[in-house]
UniProtKB/Swiss-Prot annotation:
Organism in which the protein naturally occurs: Mycosarcoma maydis (Corn smut fungus)
Alphabetized SMART domains for the sequence: WD40
SUBUNIT field: Component of the eukaryotic translation initiation factor 3 (eIF-3) complex.
UniProt-recorded name of the protein: Eukaryotic translation initiation factor 3 subunit I
Cited PROSITE patterns: WD_REPEATS_1, WD_REPEATS_2, WD_REPEATS_REGION
Family from the record: Belongs to the eIF-3 subunit I family.
UniProt keyword list: Cytoplasm, Initiation factor, Protein biosynthesis, Repeat, WD repeat
A Pfam family annotated for this UniProt entry: EIF3I
Residue windows of the WD repeats: 8-49, 50-89, 146-186, 198-237, 239-278, 295-336
HAMAP family in the record: eIF3i (MF_03008)
Task of the protein: Component of the eukaryotic translation initiation factor 3 (eIF-3) complex, which is involved in protein synthesis of a specialized repertoire of mRNAs and, together with other initiation factors, stimulates binding of mRNA and methionyl-tRNAi to the 40S ribosome. The eIF-3 complex specifically targets and initiates translation of a subset of mRNAs involved in cell proliferation.
SUPFAM superfamilies referenced in this protein's UniProt entry, alphabetically: WD40 repeat-like
Gene that produces this protein: TIF34
């Protein structure tokens, strides 16, 4: 496996994200800089500067034209990928903790923090994609959900943008029917009817499969779970010994990659091996751990897999991004024998 070490942040990583082709990698951290990298060699393409606090989240559209970011300065910003120009800024009363483009990239959702008397909320904005008027975006959201119960910390659009899936601080996963032609606003009082208690602690990450029909979650309760996007049925559970911060689904091989480790405040009192700072590979179907890959000097905060499945990137508390390219043996190996390994066209 060929690792590439990327050093472009002064503080711990919060999220890494590949574009659709996988040739670009975007990283954000607890500093105000957004970095763009060439994934094949680790060369830095450029930076996006304008935020005034921790950048919690980032997402790029399917054409690698527009970038959206959320920060602790209570802003969500829209950027032009090619030039680094900030096209528009949305202002909120609290920090923007998670942003995500819809499947057709015509909408963006943002999850805002619950703080200072303000409830946590989820807002959906329609994006004006005309290059001539990029700087003219709607300030008002097309939909607002204010959470009456435990706040949402992560969210994503489900298949065909029919649903929005949210992960909450108490371990619940919820779905909301989304129709941008008939927007709904107000306080959500029906959380119990469209949610399931998937975890016993806060959900730290939620990532969709390639077709968005199921997704994987990671939690501080030391488990990662594979969940159906429509029914919220827990399909598989992957249990570890340490809190998990991120999980991602491999698009071509039957693996789920998870990362986490002992809390950052305790890392100086233990060795790297005891802290469980490795990236872990779990078989998606058999729920068995297949491999571990060390490298970071602290907890792993975020994981993203190349859309073609040929590499993955991880960002840690140590401030580094590691891009690991898989060897041919990874794709040729049959861990459970040829009869139990799915062919690519069957997955």
């Amino acid at each position: 496996m060929r690792p590439i070490l990327l050093s472009g942040h002064e503080r711990s990583l919060t999220q890494v994200k590949f574009n659709r082709e996988g040739d670009l990698l975007f990283s954000v951290a607890k500093d105000p800089i957004i970095n763009a990298w060439f994934s094949h060699n680790g060369e830095r393409l450029g930076t996006y500067e304008g935020h005034n606090g921790t950048v919690w989240t980032v997402d790029v559209d399917s054409t690698s034209t527009l970038l959206v970011s959320g920060s602790a300065d209570n802003q969500m910003r829209l950027w032009e990928v090619a030039t680094g120009k900030c096209l528009f800024t949305w202002e909120f009363t609290t920090a923007a903790k998670r942003v995500a483009f819809s499947e057709d990239c015509s909408q963006v959702l943002v999850v805002t923090e619950q703080r200072m008397g303000f409830r946590g909320s989820l807002r959906v904005f329609r994006i004006n994609r005309d290059p001539a008027t990029w700087t003219q975006q709607d300030v008002e959201p097309t939909r607002t959900i204010t959470f009456s119960g435990p706040k949402a910390v992560v969210a994503a659009f489900a298949p065909c943008d029919q649903y929005i899936v949210t992960g909450h601080e108490d371990g619940k996963v919820a779905i909301y029917y989304h129709d941008d032609k008939e927007p709904e606003s107000g306080i959500d009082a029906e959380l119990e009817e469209n949610s399931t208690k998937a975890h016993t602690d806060v959900i730290s990450d939620l990532q969709m499969s390639a077709d968005r029909t199921y997704f994987v979650t990671s939690s501080r309760d030391k488990t990662s779970k594979l969940i159906d996007s429509k029914t919220l049925q827990v399909i598989k559970t992957y249990a570890t010994e340490t809190p998990l911060n991120s999980a991602s689904i491999h698009p071509t091989k039957p693996f789920v990659i998870v990362g986490g480790g002992q809390d950052a405040m305790n890392v100086t009192t233990t060795s790297a091996r005891q802290g469980r700072f490795e990236t872990r590979f779990w078989h998606k179907v058999f729920e068995e751990e297949c491999a571990r890959l060390p490298g970071h000097f602290g907890p792993i905060n975020t994981i993203a897999i190349h859309p073609a499945g040929i590499a993955y990137a991880s960002g840690g508390e140590d401030g580094y991004v590691r891009v690991n390219w898989f060897d041919p043996g990874f794709f040729n190996s049959k861990l459970y024998g040829a009869d139990l390994e799915l062919a690519l066209e069957d997955q």
